[in-house]
C-alpha cells in the first residue's frame, strides 16, 4: 500500500485529501465538494519506485506524438534541440503538446496522457484514467524522486459549485492482457463484433501524387487482390486545397470523383475518401473567406504545422 495525496482548488477554496492505494487496486474515485469559481488545479502524487531494469511507457498526446518505452533514466525530447529558424520555418513545435506541457531536460523525467505503464519483463503495472470528461489526465514521472504526479487539465474552467470529480483512476498489475483487459472492462469497452475492414489507400503508395488516371490504374490492380466489400480509398491529394472539401483539384480530377466512386462500386468495393475536417490550409478559400472560423490565440490564427501551405485549426467551439 502507498499513500496518495491529492488536492483540488478553485479561486474560492480548496480541498486536500489522502487515499491508500495498492498497485492492483482497480478503480479509485477522488471527488470532493468545491466552492463555485474558476478551477485552479487538481493534483495527486504518490510514491512509485521503479526497478533499474524496468521500462516506462507514457501515452502520447496524439497520434503524431513519439512515445516509445523508455528505460528508467531515459529522457523525453522536446523541441529545445531544434534550431529556432527551423522551428519558425516548419512549425515543429505545433505538432504536439510543447506549448502547454512542460518538458524537463533531466534524465528520468517523462510525461503522458490518459494512461501509463511500468514493465518488468512480462509484468505490467498500469495507471490509467477512467474519465477524461473533466479534462485530460496528465501523468508525470520523476525517477530520481520515485514519484508519480497526476494532474487534471482543468485550470481556467468554471466550476458551478458542489461535487467535483478530481480523478477517476484505475490501478492494475499482471500480464499485458490482464491489465489492459481489466481497464477496458472498467471503462465498459467491449470487443467489437463487426468484421475487420481491409482494402487499399492511395496514401501509402502515391502520397499526394494522385490523379484520375493513376487511381483507375490502382483500382484495376485492386480487382485482382481484394474481395467484394473491401475498401478502395482515395487519400490526400484529390482536393483543390485542404479545407475546400467541395472542390476537387481540376487538373488532377477534371471529372470530379463520381466516376471513380462509381467504378469502385462496380468493382464490388466500398468507396472511401480522406478528409481532415478540423483544419484548413493557408491558401484555401475557407481560410481567406472565413477567418473568423479559425482558432485564435492572442488574437491571431493558430498555425498547427507546415503541411501543405501551412494549416490552421478551426474553432469548433465557435457556433
Enumerate the predicted regions with their spans.
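N-terminal accessory beta-strand-rich subdomains and adjacent acidic, glycine-rich linkers
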Residues: 1-182
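Short, flexible loop/turn elements at secondary-structure junctions
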Residues: 10, 34-36, 50, 154, ...
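Conserved, mostly hydrophobic/aromatic
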Residues: 32, 161, 200, 232, ...
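An acidic-aromatic substrate-binding cleft motif
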Residues: 179-228, 236-240
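Loop/turn elements at helix/coil->beta-strand transitions in domains of secreted/extracellular proteins
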Residues: 195-196, 227-231, 266-272
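The substrate-binding groove and active-site-proximal loops of carbohydrate-active enzymes
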Residues: 197-213, 240-255, 305-319
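Active-site-adjacent "subsite" loops/lids of carbohydrate-active enzymes
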Residues: 204, 273-319
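Acidic/aromatic-lined carbohydrate-recognition and catalytic surfaces
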Residues: 235-290
